Amino acid sequence: MTRIVWMIGGAQGLGVDTSANIFGNAVAKAGYYLFGNREYYSNIKGRHSYFEVVISEKPIRSLSSYVNILASFDAETVFQHFTETKEYLIYNVEYENTTVDLVKSMEPEMAEQVKEALSKERLGFTIKDVLEYLKRRGVKVIGFNYTELIKKIADTFKVPMSVVERAKNMIAVGASYGLLGLKFDYLKDAISSTFKNELFIKFNTMAAELGYNSVPNVYKLQEYKIEKQRIQVDGNTISAMGKLAGGLRFQSYYPITPASDESVYIEANQNLDMIVEGNELRKGGVVVVQAEDELAAINMAVGAALTGVRSATATSGPGFSLMSEGISWAGMNEVPVVITYYMRGAPATGLPTRSGQADLKFALNVGHGEFPRIVIASGDHVEIFWDAIWALNLAEKYQTPVIHIIEKTLANAYSVFEEELITNRPYVIERGKIVKPTSDYFNRFEVTEDGISPRVFLGQASIFYTGDEHNEEGHITENSINRMKMYEKRNKKLETADKEIPEEQRVNIVGDADIVLLTWGSPKGAILDAMEELSKDGIKTMMVQVKMFNPYPKNLMKKILSGKSKIIAVENNYNAQGAEVLAEKTGIFATNYILKWTGRPITREEVIEGIKKILERDEKRVVLYGGA
């Protein structure tokens, strides 16, 4: 199976993302599957960012620790990624004499790592020395004088060089595409569909062609016919699509990385054709509100839910912290609201543009007091879509806050897959116990056998909501007997959910072996790809991915894990929080750990290396460091 890893890097604000999307689009048009990931600093312009794209004729689920083709147009990209580069480097010859110390945007720690790698080879600290380092390892270097080529393009179209400056990206993209050996027409089409200005299309196409014609066809990739409609989508977008398919009618948010793009997409696509009762088709839409802060965002979402619309908000760590009191209020008042929690590097501001899984226990215990919080976590883009619908259904059925965890890795990564994976079954909407009032007064918190009360909406009858303890009507009371009754009623809903939601729906099990890879969230893809490689070496493994953490599938987990010789927790945090929850709920402990908390994704190769260290050296805890 083909697996080619391509990377492009450069200063933020200079078109790295656009270049990567054009390249990926062109490769996908030739019938290939992709998995791409964007890494960037918490800086608007100037700092180093890069985009990695993995290419294969079969579906791809993970990133790699190496790069086959590194496309660069600045010095920092070469310095940051030369040790990962295995086959080809495309670089700017004008920077050959640039030293590490002259790259002022590079962090001192990274500069020291570069010097250490070059010093081991008794080399200096210039780009020219990096080229020698790569040549010693069989990497071929392809240099371009970008200024000369940009001048040629500017002269051709009789425009100033400043107008076509960013077209140098397309020179690197064109050269990369040429190495693959795919038809230039696909790249030309991708450029045309990206830019609207005719002049921009022309000079970017010329730049790409200059690069394309300057390199040999090395990989000789063949074109594949696309049999079924495919979709190329990132995590923010697929979550928004799932919410729209699930009947979302109100979304509030305050801008925060990496959550904001979801709300922006919903707002851009808020006018919808809706099928309502009786199969009647009518125009409708979603109200999207950018609030003044996260406190307002959660309170707006709660208020909208009380009026009877499907309501959600989206945020990340610091914003989720601010929402804590509002979530507790929603728990007390049994409000069906969804909080999409985009997890990033923490604590505090932490790593605002990097990933992490350190907030699982926070999500499980957010808000003061004991009340039901349903918590689910998605492992890939298809799961995100269906889980977004599921979250809305769970919130209304059990009348409680639902927290849907998506990590930054999945939010900013994109994948290519068959569209039928998100259209192959009906979008079922379950609204729970909604009734029409029969009088002016309604006991909103009526005690029932399953803990779930009939629900009407604001304006349909006299209903009372308060943050204080209350009786069935909603009136404030501190009576001890009532307190016991209402407290049990609220918490009984989680017991009901535990009985009604099949445990098989809460856990994803792949394979059957004595070695278990226990995980949740984004490591899923790296694990599945690693399992395929490990099986070639005769190492049989199985994956157990927890999708719902509350209510926890304790009975099924006990059944699956009982008697296994190795339970290896693979997570993006320090404490293996998913494994800690397993121990808390079942008394079963992980035997080994593969952990990473650098803010970068776990790769396929890191999982393979970690498992081999555990099996061959009996290492208890393998810590991963990869990623620039």
Swiss-Prot record:
Say yes or no: keyword Oxidoreductase present.
Answer: yes
Q: Which domain of life is it from?
A: Archaea
Enzyme Commission (EC) number: 1.2.7.11
Please cite one Gene Ontology biological process associated with this protein. response to oxidative stress
Q: Which transformation does this protein catalyse, written as a reaction?
A: a 2-oxocarboxylate + 2 oxidized [2Fe-2S]-[ferredoxin] + CoA = an acyl-CoA + 2 reduced [2Fe-2S]-[ferredoxin] + CO2 + H(+)
- TM region positions: none
Q: Which PANTHER family match?
A: PYRUVATE FLAVODOXIN_FERREDOXIN OXIDOREDUCTASE DOMAIN PROTEIN, PYRUVATE-FLAVODOXIN OXIDOREDUCTASE-RELATED
Q: How does it assemble?
A: Heterodimer composed of an alpha and a beta subunit.
Query: Per the entry's comment, what about the domains?
Result: The Tyr-Pro-Ile-Thr-Pro (YPITP) motif is important for the turnover of the reaction, presumably through its flexibility and mobility.
- UniProt protein name: 2-oxoacid:ferredoxin oxidoreductase 2, subunit alpha
Q: Which organism is it from?
A: Sulfurisphaera tokodaii (strain DSM 16993 / JCM 10545 / NBRC 100140 / 7) (Sulfolobus tokodaii)
